[in-house]
Amino acid sequence: RARFSRWLRTPEPKALLNASIFFDFRPLYGDDELSDALRTWLVDAVREAPLFLRLMAANALQCRPPLGLLRDFRFDRNEAFPRTLDLKLYGTRPFVDAARVLALANGVAHTGTVQRLRGVGEIARMGGDDVAAIVDGFGFIQLLRLQRQRSMQPGAAGANRIDPDALNELDRHILKKSFGQARKLQSRLALDFRL
């Protein structure tokens, strides 16, 4: 508690990074009662730290989905894997980060991204169809990512990257729509925190 409290009171870059990692804790062994009590305390404490939440929201908006203005894919400058998309960094991370902040802001104690999104949807008056579309977008990107990893040697470089031209037309279309759902979720986050 003391460490989490310190991060909430002094939201500097290192504290924000630590929070994005450690606030997703889960019990590994034994009685869940201790972790449940810590999670309940944390959810309440974070809601009393609006500056911390706002800075976490700003951080969550730093990693944008790789869509250009005309909804074409936007590629990073990775020389080892040109014209590929990093599905972890630019695909799942926007969902995970936004879901974490929205869950903390709305008192949702879940640690899984899908459960957080559904919990926030119930509390924050997000339409059920909107939440379902966001969850489906996240799920599709995760599916592509896991399929890619399964097709490669364990530990191989580029396991989270995909060449969209290697996808069939339908999967490319769904991937664009999925990135659009990440963008929509980030827009909600920006609106909620006036960023």
Predicted feature descriptions by range:
Residues R1-L195:
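A nucleotide- and high-energy phosphate-metabolite-utilizing enzyme signature
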